[in-house]
Amino acid sequence: MAKKNYIIGIDAGTTGIRTFCFNDKGKVISSAYQEFKQYYPKPGWVEHDPEEIWVKTQKLITLAIKNGKLNPKDAVAIGITNQRETSVVWDKKTGKPVYNAIVWQCRRTSDICKDLKKQSLDSNFRNKTGLVLDAYFSGTKIQWILDNVKGARDRAERGDLLFGTIDTWLLYKLTGHKEHKTDHTNASRTLLFNIQTKEWDEELCKILRVPMSMLPKAFNSKNLFGFTSNVKSIPDGIPISSLVGDQQGALFGQLCTEPGEAKNTYGTGCFLLFNVGDEFRISNQGLITTLALGPEGKTVYCLEGSVFIGGAVVQFLRDNLEFFKYSKDSEKLVKSIKTKDDIVFVPAFAGLGAPHWDQEARGAIFGLSRDTTPAQITRAALKAIALQSYELANAMEKETGKPLKFLRVDGGATSNAWLMQFQADILGTKVIRPQNVDTTVLGAAYLAGLERGFFKSVAHLRKEETKTTQFTPKMKESERKEEIDKWNLAISRVKTET
C-alpha cells in the first residue's frame, strides 16, 4: 500500500457520527456515517448514551479508513468537532458515565434558569460568558446531574467525577483516559467560562454549585491535546491536534477568519455566526457573544444566533409523522405543490432560541384545513427553517449596522435546493453554498492540519477553495413581506414571554 498521509476528522453531531479522511488539499478522500439513538424520557427532555457515541466513533474511524483504502499508520492527526453544550459526567477511576449525556436541546433545567433570573443573576452570566441564562447551555445540566443522580454531588466534591462536553469525552476515550481537556469554543458554551479572561470562573461555578475540580483544562482549538492510546484498529500515538465546537468549526471551515465574515449552518438547528475579531461586545438584539477562530486559528469573538430546530423539523416529519422515507424526499414533495396556502409551521419543539429566548414556547401549525396535505405541511416546515434564519440575519444587521451582502451556508439541509432558493428570496440577498457542505468537520481538519504543519497556512487553504453554487433572490418584494408578516404573527401566538 503506497504511503498517503491524511487527516482524520470526527464530526460528533446531534443525531449521528460522521468520520472523514482528508488529503493535503483539504479534500475528502473517504467518509462513514451512522446515526445513534435519541432518548426522550419526558416531554422536553433529550438524552444520548455516551458509550454508544464512543463505540460508534471507533467503528466509523475504522470504516472511513477502510473506505479510502488507507493505511491507519499514515494518519497525520485527528481533529474533532462536536455538538456543543451536550453534557457528560463520568467517574474518574472507571471512565463510566454516571448518567446519560444531557443534550443541548433538553429543557429540563428551565426552572433552574428561571430561579437564577428571579435572583437578578442574568448580568453576572451575560457579562462574563456572553450567554443568556437558558437551559440550552451546559452549566445547569451539570447541576441537575449532581442533584439528581444518587451520590453524584458527594462524589464530585471529593474530586471523583469529571465533566466534559462531547469533545472532551471523546478525547478522554481516544487517549486511553489520559487527557481531560477541552477547547475555548466548547468551554465558552457552559455558562462557567469567562470569555474575556479565557478561564473557568469561580463565582459562576459557585452560583451553579459546580466543583471546579470537575472541569477540563481549556486550550486554543488548534493545540496538541494528546495522542491515541488503546483505540481499536488504529495505532497508538496519532496526535489529536484540534477540538472545536461544531459551529465555530464551520466558521473556520468556510474560512470566515476576518471580522465581518459570517456563515449559517443548517444542521439539527441553525446557527448564524458573525466574526467580530478582537472586540468583546454584548448584543442588544437577542444574539449571544461567543468565542471563535481567526487567522491561523487564533481565538477571537463572534456574535451568534442560535435556532434550536432547523433540519430536525424534517427528521420530525420523516420519523414521527412518516410523511416520507428519506429526508431528501422532502424537496421532491414540496416541488409537487402547484398552489399557494397560508400554512405556517413554528417548530418550537425545544422552545425558541435567538432572538426570542422563550424556553416555554412550543411548536404549532397555523392555517390547517380539511384539504391540507403532507406536502403543504412539509413546505411550511422548510419555510420555517429559512424564516428562523431570516430572524437571525435581521438581528445581526441591526446589531452591526451593516447590511448582509451575501450569506455563506453549509450543513446537511443545504443540499435541499428549494430551501436554499427560498432562503435567498426571504433574505433578499445572495446565498452561497460550497461544494463540500460538511464544513464543521472541515474546520476541525484544517485546524488539526495547521497545528501539525500538514497545511501551510489559511492563505494556502483559500487557494484550494472549490467552486460554489449561488442562489439569487427571485421573489417579489410584496410576496416576501407577506411571508415575513405571516411568520411574525405566528411567532407572536406561540411566545409565552414578552
Swiss-Prot record:
- One BP term from GO: glycerol-3-phosphate metabolic process
What's one Pfam family here? FGGY_C
| InterPro entries named among the record's database cross-references | ATPase_NBD (IPR043129), Carb_kinase_FGGY (IPR000577), Carb_kinase_FGGY_CS (IPR018483), FGGY_C (IPR018485), FGGY_N (IPR018484), Glycerol_kin (IPR005999)
Q: Catalyzes what?
A: glycerol + ATP = sn-glycerol 3-phosphate + ADP + H(+)
Chain residues that bind ADP: 14, 18, 268, 311, 412, 416
**Binding, glycerol:** 84-85, 136, 246-247
Q: Where does sn-glycerol 3-phosphate bind?
A: 14, 84-85, 136, 246
Q: Name one GO molecular function term.
A: glycerol kinase activity
Q: Which keywords fit this entry according to its UniProt record?
A: ATP-binding, Glycerol metabolism, Kinase, Nucleotide-binding, Transferase
Please state what class of enzyme this protein is. Answer: transferase
Name the Gene3D superfamilies on file: 3.30.420.40
> What is the activity regulation entry?
Inhibited by fructose 1,6-bisphosphate (FBP).
Residues annotated for ATP binding in this entry: 14-15, 268, 311, 315, 412
A single GO cellular-component term from the record reads: cytosol
Q: Does the keyword Ligase apply?
A: no
Name the pathway: Polyol metabolism; glycerol degradation via glycerol kinase pathway; sn-glycerol 3-phosphate from glycerol: step 1/1
User: EC annotation?
Assistant: 2.7.1.30
HAMAP family on file: Glycerol_kin
Q: What is the role of the protein in this entry?
A: Key enzyme in the regulation of glycerol uptake and metabolism. Catalyzes the phosphorylation of glycerol to yield sn-glycerol 3-phosphate.
Regarding protein family, the annotation reads: Belongs to the FGGY kinase family.
The name this protein goes by in its record: Glycerol kinase
What is the primary gene name for this protein?
Answer: glpK
